């Protein structure tokens, strides 16, 4: 250890060796310090996994890597990865393959890496503070901004949920050979809110086990389709390695990038990581947890990338350059596959339906889970989990039922609806990403785990790029859809308010003095300096 480091450590105030409650008070703005009993409640014990086998040991550096411990940390990243595999993403994949062939696979890879960066920052804020993003927003922003952020998050979640529930309903319709109409599928799917409540009571590992089965089902289904259709491996690798973007594929490219950041997923991941018991007072333990979550999340998104690649390649092989390419969508994709590749021992239509059902069910359950954290975090509501799940589910099921009944027989109408829902979710991205980057780069919130200048610049660059891509999509959509002076005037007024709120969020900084400032230097010593 260098002499200057020792000097800083000796002259700096010692980190408080106090109770967990007092430590949490350091993380809350001084002007809004809650009483001990008002601090957020920890999850029930059966939802927290103890990962510290050697909790009695004291480490001067990050504990050594352990495969057994990595296994214990495995779970939250795979739940997070579901948002990269929802029916909206699957539809984006199939349309990208049908319209652009293999040429956008490089963009799919880089978009997944950008999404990984944002999710790692979400995990970082959850582990380092012991609170999830919605809770931190509640304590940091003024009431009006907090309520508006909650509303935006709920709107994005409802939009995503409608897509996911309809995706599951379409899958059920396929698997029952049209016997179940879409609206009946919506009713069946709505009961998963009670399933998640039951699995939560059984333990976090049971819930994670369900998602492991659903992800494996998707992987096997779409891998089987990939093997059955035999896409060109050479063209596939060229598409991954060589960037190529034609004027006719810009819309599909925007769709690929726009799907990588799902607003509710940013809030969800910061809460999921708290299912592993990590003491925020132990700097080395926190760093250890972040290391394991980085490995686990990277592995999870590698799996999601491969599943998305399988779907894109299957439709690139079957429909690129055909007359069906411009009309293919989630509703008719299975029938196009059946017409193209026939039946066989395992008809491809049903394999597609099974994969789509797994995608829809897994994403609706994670959406319900995210809704609980968003509502309880922003509004500080304490209620039974089943009731919270039911309320959250109702926000989405009621409009979804209306949509399913209205558009049950019209494939074209469902495609138009899906386009509107993509626009709705794209509009909400800034209201998840900007608070995340603001908080994770704030020393008052993060202490020694505040991200450095280089990572902060990279994160903001990625965020601005994704928001610009979605801004292009919004502009293109509204220019095509908005007609008339009155409608145009109302849209203009909405855009002004929308941009004003974004500017407020970007320029916002906590006015509270840092509770960590006097402690940072003493904690900046890590194992590499010894």
Swiss-Prot record:
Any one GO BP annotation for this protein: iron ion transport
Superkingdom of this protein's organism: Eukaryota
UniProt feature, compositional bias: Polar residues: 1-10
Subcellular location: Membrane
Pfam families to which the protein is assigned, alphabetical: Nramp
Membrane topology: Multi-pass membrane protein
GO cellular component: membrane
Name of this protein: Metal transporter Nramp5
Organism this protein belongs to: Arabidopsis thaliana
């Amino acid at each position: 250890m260098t002499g200057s480091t020792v000097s800083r450590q000796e002259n700096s105030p010692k980190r408080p060796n106090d109770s967990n409650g007092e430590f949490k008070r350091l993380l809350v703005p001084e002007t809004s310090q809650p009483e001990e009993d008002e601090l957020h409640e920890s999850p029930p014990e059966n939802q927290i996994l103890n990962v510290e086998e050697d909790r009695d040991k004291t480490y001067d550096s990050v504990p050594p890597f352990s495969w057994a411990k990595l296994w214990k940390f495995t779970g939250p990243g795979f739940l997070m990865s579901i948002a990269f595999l929802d029916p909206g993403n699957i539809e984006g994949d199939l349309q990208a393959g049908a319209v652009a062939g293999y040429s956008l696979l490089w963009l799919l890879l880089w978009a997944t890496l950008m999404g990984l960066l944002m999710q790692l920052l979400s995990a970082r804020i959850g582990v380092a503070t012991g609170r999830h993003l919605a809770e931190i927003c509640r304590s940091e922003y003024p009431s009006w901004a907090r309520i508006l952020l909650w509303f935006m998050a709920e709107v994005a979640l409802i939009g995503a949920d409608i897509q996911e529930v309809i995706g599951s309903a379409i899958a059920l319709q396929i698997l029952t050979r049209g016997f179940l109409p879409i609206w009946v599928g919506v009713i069946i799917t709505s009961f998963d809110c009670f399933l998640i409540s039951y699995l939560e009571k059984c333990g976090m590992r049971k819930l994670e086990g369900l998602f492991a089965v659903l992800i494996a089902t998707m992987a096997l289904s779409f891998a089987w389709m990939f093997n059955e259709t035999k896409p060109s491996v050479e063209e596939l690798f060229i598409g991954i390695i060589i960037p190529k973007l034609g004027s006719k594929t810009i819309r599909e490219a925007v769709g690929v990038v726009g799907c990588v950041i799902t607003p509710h997923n940013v809030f969800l991941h910061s809460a999921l990581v708290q299912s592993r018991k990590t003491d925020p007072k132990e700097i080395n333990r926190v760093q250890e947890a972040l290391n394991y979550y980085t490995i686990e999340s990277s592995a999870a998104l590698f799996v999601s990338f491969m599943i998305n690649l399988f779907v894109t390649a299957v439709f690139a092989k079957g429909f690129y350059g055909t007359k069906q390419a411009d009309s293919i969508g989630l509703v008719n994709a299975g029938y196009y596959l059946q017409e193209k590749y026939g039946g066989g021992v395992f008809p491809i239509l049903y394999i597609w339906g099974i994969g789509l059902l797994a995608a829809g069910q897994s994403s609706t359950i994670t959406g319900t889970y995210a809704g609980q954290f968003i509502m309880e975090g922003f509004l500080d509501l304490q209620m039974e989990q089943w009731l919270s799940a039911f309320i959250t589910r109702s926000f989405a099921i009621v409009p979804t039922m209306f949509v399913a009944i209205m558009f049950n027989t019209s494939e074209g109408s469902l495609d138009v609806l899906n386009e509107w829902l993509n626009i709705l979710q794209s509009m909400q991205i800034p209201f998840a990403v900007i608070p995340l980057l603001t908080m994770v780069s704030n020393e008052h919130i993060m202490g020694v785990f505040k991200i450095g200048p280089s990572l902060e610049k990279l994160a903001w660059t990625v965020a601005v790029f994704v928001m610009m891509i979605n801004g292009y999509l919004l502009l293109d959509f509204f220019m095509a859809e908005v007609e008339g002076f009155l409608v145009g005037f109302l849209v203009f007024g909405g855009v002004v308010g929308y941009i004003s709120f974004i500017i407020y969020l970007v320029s916002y900084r906590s006015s509270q003095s840092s509770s960590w400032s006097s402690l940072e230097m003493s904690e900046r010593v890590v194992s590499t300096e010894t």
